[in-house]
């Protein structure tokens, strides 16, 4: 089976990708989205989102990385897809699933689910602009407020020439509510298409991954939030390994505080460490205690001192 690390805006940046791929066995990472509006973006934008471009589009541990684009104008999606791959990205992905109100308000992400023809035009333009040996992939949800158009959406992706499709098993309106996950609908899409379909949504451990694959028939999954709850989740999902022990999680956090974010003004780790602990608290009691000890701190250096001082 393949396990992919999902794009998560404001969460899974290059530093977190570096950490997680070092202790996992991911087959691929997708970047946070590059927002495309009405221009060919400068090279520095791609390097900021995906510094791995400077290293053959791989993390330090060797996991391939693919740039994701977010936008609605086929011409500019195509030109930026061509630039991304010219810079070395291992293919390019089109975001048709982000449920953020800010993103949707500008016509991107899940908004495209209301217009399968636009998904087709965007993906087709990207496919034409990217060398044929490199993948062009698309990530979608089941629909905007219902799954009634899920086949129309999936057909648009395949007919555009996409290499594979990632399907998050909920509509935009359903957000991330667990009770609405529909792996069976993903399976119906998989049966309809000839390109590979990757299942995404509510995969937290070995059991849920097995259930997802059994229900959907997919042999590949993409994991997002769960990868932060259990830092070695790909190995849990692939090999039924136990979750990472807390002392190893601490070691990972300690390394994180030592990594430097380009352009950081001393605040980067404040938000990111607290955010990550918010995920870890769902699996580790110790994470709650650590969060309480740093919640009032507002400088990266202060948080680093607390975490580095933990005895393991």
From Swiss-Prot:
Gene3D superfamilies: Aldolase class I (3.20.20.70), Dihydrouridine synthase, C-terminal recognition domain (1.20.225.30). Signal peptide: none annotated. GO terms for molecular function: flavin adenine dinucleotide binding; FMN binding; tRNA binding; tRNA-dihydrouridine16 synthase activity. SUPFAM superfamilies: FMN-linked oxidoreductases. The active site is at residue 98. Keywords: Flavoprotein, FMN, NADP, Oxidoreductase, RNA-binding, tRNA processing, tRNA-binding. FMN binds at residues 7-9, 68, 139, 200-202, 224-225. InterPro entries: Aldolase_TIM, DUS-like_FMN-bd, DUS_fam, DusC, DusC_C, tRNA_hU_synthase_CS. It comes from the Bacteria. Its EC number is 1.3.1.-. It catalyses: 5,6-dihydrouridine(16) in tRNA + NADP(+) = uridine(16) in tRNA + NADPH + H(+); 5,6-dihydrouridine(16) in tRNA + NAD(+) = uridine(16) in tRNA + NADH + H(+). It is an enzyme of class 1 (oxidoreductase). Pfam families: Dus (PF01207). The record marks 35, 95, 176, 272, 274, 279, 295 as: Interacts with tRNA. Its cofactor is FMN. The keyword tRNA processing applies. Catalyzes the synthesis of 5,6-dihydrouridine (D), a modified base found in the D-loop of most tRNAs, via the reduction of the C5-C6 double bond in target uridines. Specifically modifies U16 in tRNAs. Belongs to the Dus family. DusC subfamily. NCBIfam families: PRK10550.1 (NF007838). This is tRNA-dihydrouridine(16) synthase. The lineage of its organism: Bacteria, Pseudomonadati, Pseudomonadota, Gammaproteobacteria, Enterobacterales. The gene is dusC.
């Amino acid at each position: 089976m393949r396990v992919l690390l999902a794009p998560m805006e404001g969460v899974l940046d290059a530093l977190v990708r570096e950490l997680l791929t070092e202790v996992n066995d991911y087959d691929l990472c997708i970047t946070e989205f590059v927002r495309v509006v009405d221009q060919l973006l400068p090279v520095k934008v791609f390097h900021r989102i995906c510094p791995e471009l400077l290293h053959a589009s791989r993390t330090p541990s060797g996991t391939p990385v693919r740039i994701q684009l977010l936008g609605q104008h086929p011409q500019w999606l195509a030109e930026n897809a061509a630039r991304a791959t010219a810079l070395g990205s291992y293919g390019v992905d089109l975001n048709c699933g982000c449920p953020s109100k800010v993103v949707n308000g500008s016509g991107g992400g899940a908004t495209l689910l209301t217009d399968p023809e636009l998904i087709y035009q965007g993906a087709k333009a990207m496919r034409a602009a990217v060398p044929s040996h490199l993948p062009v992939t698309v990530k979608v949800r089941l629909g905007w407020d219902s799954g009634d158009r899920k086949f129309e959406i999936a057909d648009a992706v395949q007919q555009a020439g996409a290499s594979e499709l990632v399907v998050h098993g909920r509509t935009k309106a359903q957000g991330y509510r667990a009770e609405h996950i529909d792996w069976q609908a993903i399976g119906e899409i998989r049966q309809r298409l000839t390109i590979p379909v990757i299942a995404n949504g509510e995969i937290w451990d070995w059991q849920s991954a097995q259930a997802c694959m059994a229900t959907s028939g997919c042999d590949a999954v993409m994991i997002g939030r769960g990868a932060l709850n259990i830092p070695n989740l790909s190995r849990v999902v692939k090999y039924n390994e136990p979750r990472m022990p807390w002392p190893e999680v601490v070691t990972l956090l300690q390394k994180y505080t030592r990594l430097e974010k380009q352009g950081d003004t001393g605040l980067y780790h404040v938000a990111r460490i607290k955010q990550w602990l918010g995920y870890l608290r769902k699996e580790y009691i110790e994470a709650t205690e650590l969060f309480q000890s740093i919640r009032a701190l507002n400088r990266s250096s202060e948080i680093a001192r607390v975490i580095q001082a933990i005895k393991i």
